[in-house]
Amino acid sequence: KKARQGVKIRAMFDAFGNLSNNKPLRAKHIKLLLQHDIEIVQFDPMRFPYINHALSRDHQKIVVIDGKVGYTGGMNIANYYINGLPEIGAWRDMHVRIEGDAVNDLQRIFLYMWNSETKQNIGGDEFFPLSQPGVKTNGNKQVAIVNRIPKKQPKLLRHTYIEAINAAKRKIQLINPYFTPTHSVVKALEDALARGVRVEIMIPGKSDIPFTPDAAFYAANQLRKKGAFIYIYNGGFHHSKIMMIDERFCTVGSMNLNSRS
């Protein structure tokens, strides 16, 4: 509909992630989109040997509209977000809408990924409006975009989480669907518990990935023994990736608490 109205649409999806979708994009779907003048490309198409492509994927979820409105978080564009999955039920997630200067950061990330994959060189003022309307925030809140480009800066997001955990004085609240944290994240949480910080962790009781709940239960139980409070979400599958520190700082994004993310 928007393409028929003259809106230029560019879309990128991860080739490996698409294969794991319950209703993946097929060649016929891509052909139909291209026929409607929608540019759509795969990030890092799967080629032999496939193992070389399995780990460093594009897990970002970004939408930028007219360079003025951005969306990011944990949500994929998939059928199961509407209908759920028979084996796990309804799918729950968290996304945020952003307006103002922080949208420029999301735009830069998209353009970098797009130009790197397509070898195009798009950019310029049309993507970065010179003036953004003033956007009121509740209590002068600040927004920062922290990004890890696939195959680059592998520890950036991990360090961001650890620094936030280390800064906690009263409470840490985590929701993550695949809770198998690295040793460094576990140590940061254990150190927080040792200094009297309340740590609350919510993990889903069911998962779209086999054996993930078992691994998450084990990791969470180890922290429970150190004093953490563990909550199991049984209302379907909770795909959100959220961390709150002292009810003052919050992350909403696409990073899972596992070594791959």
Give residue ranges: language-model regions.
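Charged, low-complexity intrinsically disordered terminal segments
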Residues: 1-261
